Design a protein with these regions (language model features):
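N-terminal/domain-start alpha-helical segments
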Residues: 1-85
Length: 85
């Protein structure tokens, strides 16, 4: 079974992604911040990472940079930002 790491701090989005992916036959793990994401990443292999940009502790860019130093696992960056700053 392919495993996907969901890194998202919003509980509703976590649940939506987890439910959709598990219903499609994927195994999932959920991290609510950048530190938890790195801990899970080091603890078990994943086939894909869905990574929110805006996270507590370490943002998505920082997490991506640290993972890229060790792995070429595919990463899809997500954001709920909808306006211009």
């Amino acid at each position: 079974m392919k495993r996907i790491l969901i890194v998202e701090d919003e509980p509703d989005i976590q649940e939506l992604l987890r439910t959709y992916l598990e219903d499609a036959g994927y195994g999932t793990a959920v991290a609510e911040d950048g530190v938890a994401a790195l801990s899970l990443f080091h603890a078990q292999p994943f086939d894909l990472i869905l990574l929110d940009l805006m996270l507590p502790k370490i943002d998505g860019f920082g997490v991506c940079e640290m993972i890229r130093q060790q792995s070429q696992v595919p990463i899809i960056m997500l954001t709920a930002l909808d306006g211009e700053d």
